[in-house]
From Swiss-Prot:
Record protein name field: Chaperonin GroEL
Pfam families in the cross-refs: Cpn60_TCP1
HAMAP family: CH60
Cell location: Cytoplasm
Length: 548
């Protein structure tokens, strides 16, 4: 086992604080509407330019291992805030830096670290309750657009696009962000259920001008198996041909003789058929087939539940108003499934979302909810260069997370004002002893830090602005974009309550751990092994001449 380097008490805390400051100073320059850019070097390609706090934090690794531990713990604050609310990473970092700096000063002055932590926790718990009381529901699209605009660094077009997307697909709908092809941002909305599987044979195409298969009021056969023998499908095909409607087959695969026969029947006009593979893999494929069955009012023909394809009837088939299939995607529009069954299925998937542990699973489940509940919107980000595209895409994603958080828990006045108001409301809070009171004061002072940093970034004097804002009440604050005072909510400067709450809670949590740190342990740096060329007696062979 490698030897360890151990530091105690003040030595450890000073090193840790130095690491915290390096990371926080790099992140906090991006805060506010006049936040600066940070340029990140990449080992290949052009450097990345960003104003996204968590992107900056992720890039930072320090050479000194003790300092790096401090930096990594604050990075954890940014990541946690990002995971919980999708935004507020810079605010969380600024809060954490302030609590750690003031807290460590108090520890150095002889205060008890555990009591300080208790005081900080008490203040934060009270602040969270006050934040909830200040929160205003965010329901109309104007408020949603304002939240999106603020989070996208005052880019109004992004705010409007997100509000429009939410109008189209609902609050629960899936909104994804992709690279666009032009200079303008665009919004694409896919109505109905779409999945990433195209036609199995180009011979199914009946709209050559668009290269797509369009089926009007088709029957939909859902099979959880490979279909290679046409005989087992004959009863269904005959029944569909009699009904005079087209048929869409969604199965694990359709191959060989079965596919060839379907193609021939389609080309001869005997029965209009198209076949696609079922979306997903393994258990997820079974679940998605069941989703489609619920949406279209059909049944999944599965041998697991004792159903055979030969015995399938028209009652087992789903139906939809229209189906459009192209090379890569299939879209089912207006399935005839019962609304109650669809809502039941959505509720069931929501329950799974609550229990999901990984982000990937949660995202996939949310996509399934959206496909059942209404549709998917795609925001295509336009930009002149790839560097600008990356930067803008990160901002749009942030704005999207912020608007979701706003719809969930409501909004408070932005620009750091909500925390100032909360701090003034809990200013009389007292702990059980003097050290806890100092902890409460540390937390209250930290709540001013975001406003001060926003003001500093736009080149004004933080103390003057902070005192003016404290002198006002309600939503009165400082608009850093226009450099004027007024009602923040009326000016459209809003922060999602969830973002502000998460930032404060995670900052206090990690800062509390760091204040109560008494010892740090890390591996000693390995001493470089001697160069083999210089080792041994070989280098000294030249001296052998003296032996003669």
């Amino acid at each position: 086992m490698a030897a360890k380097d151990v530091k105690f008490g003040n030595d450890a805390r000073v090193k840790m604080l130095r690491g915290v400051n390096v990371l926080a100073d790099a992140v906090k320059v991006t805060l506010g509407p006049k936040g600066r850019n940070v340029v990140l070097d990449k080992s290949f390609g052009a450097p990345n330019i960003t104003k996204d706090g968590v992107s900056v934090a992720r890039e930072i690794e320090l050479e000194d291992k003790f300092e790096n531990m401090g930096a990594q713990m604050v990075k954890e604050v940014a990541s946690k805030a990002n995971d919980a609310a999708g935004d507020g990473t810079t605010t969380a970092t600024v809060l954490a830096q302030s609590i750690i700096t003031e807290g460590l000063k108090a520890v150095a002055a002889g205060m008890n670290p555990m009591d300080l932590k208790r005081g900080i926790d008490k203040a934060v718990a009270a602040a969270v309750e006050e934040l909830k009381a200040l929160s205003v529901p965010c329901s109309d699209s104007k408020a949603i657009a304002q939240v999106g605009t603020i989070s996208a660094n005052s880019d109004e077009t992004v705010g409007k696009l997100i509000a429009e997307a939410m109008d189209k697909v609902g609050k629960e709908g899936v909104i994804t962000v992709e690279d666009g092809t032009g200079l303008q941002d665009e919004l694409d909305v896919v109505e109905g259920m779409q999945f990433d599987r195209g036609y199995l044979s180009p011979y199914f195409i009946n709209k050559p001008e668009t290269g797509a298969v369009e089926l009007e009021s088709p029957f939909i056969l859902l099979a959880d198996k490979k279909i290679s023998n046409i005989r087992e499908m004959l009863p269904v095909l005959e029944a569909v041909a009699k009904a005079g409607k087209p048929l869409l087959i969604i199965a694990e695969d359709v191959e060989g003789e079965a596919l060839a026969t379907l193609v021939v029947n389609t080309m001869r006009g005997i029965v209009k058929v198209a076949a696609v593979k079922a979306p997903g893999f393994g258990d997820r494929r079974k679940a998605m087939l069941q989703d489609i069955a619920t949406l279209t009012g059909g049944t999944v023909i599965s041998e697991e539940i004792g159903m055979e394809l030969e015995k399938a009837t028209l009652e087992d088939l789903g139906q939809a108003k229209r189906v459009v299939i192209n090379k890569d995607t299939t879209t089912i529009i207006d399935g005839v499934g019962e609304e109650a069954a669809i809502q039941g299925r959505v509720a069931q998937i929501r329950q799974q979302i609550e229990e999901a542990t990984s982000d990937y699973d949660r995202e996939k489940l949310q996509e399934r909810v959206a496909k059942l509940a209404g549709g998917v919107a795609v925001i295509k980000v336009g930009a002149a260069t790839e560097v600008e595209m990356k930067e803008k895409k990160a901002r749009v994603e942030d704005a999207l997370h912020a608007t979701r958080a706003a719809v969930e828990e409501g909004v408070v006045a932005g620009g750091g004002v909500a925390l100032i108001r909360v701090a003034s409301k809990i200013a009389d809070l007292k702990g059980q002893n003097e050290d806890q009171n100092v902890g409460i004061k540390v937390a209250l002072r930290a709540m001013e830090a975001p406003l001060r940093q926003i003001v500093l970034n736009c080149g004004e004097e933080p103390s003057v602005v902070a005192n003016t804002v404290k002198g006002g009440d309600g939503n009165y604050g400082y608009n850093a974009a226009t450099e004027e005072y007024g009602n923040m909510i009326d000016m459209g400067i809003l922060d999602p309550t969830k973002v502000t709450r998460s930032a404060l809670q995670y900052a206090a949590s990690v800062a509390g751990l760091m204040i109560t740190t008494e010892c740090m342990v890390t591996d000693l740096p390995k001493s470089d092994a001697p160069d083999l060329g210089a080792a041994g007696g070989m280098g000294g062979m030249g001296g052998m001449g003296g032996m003669m």
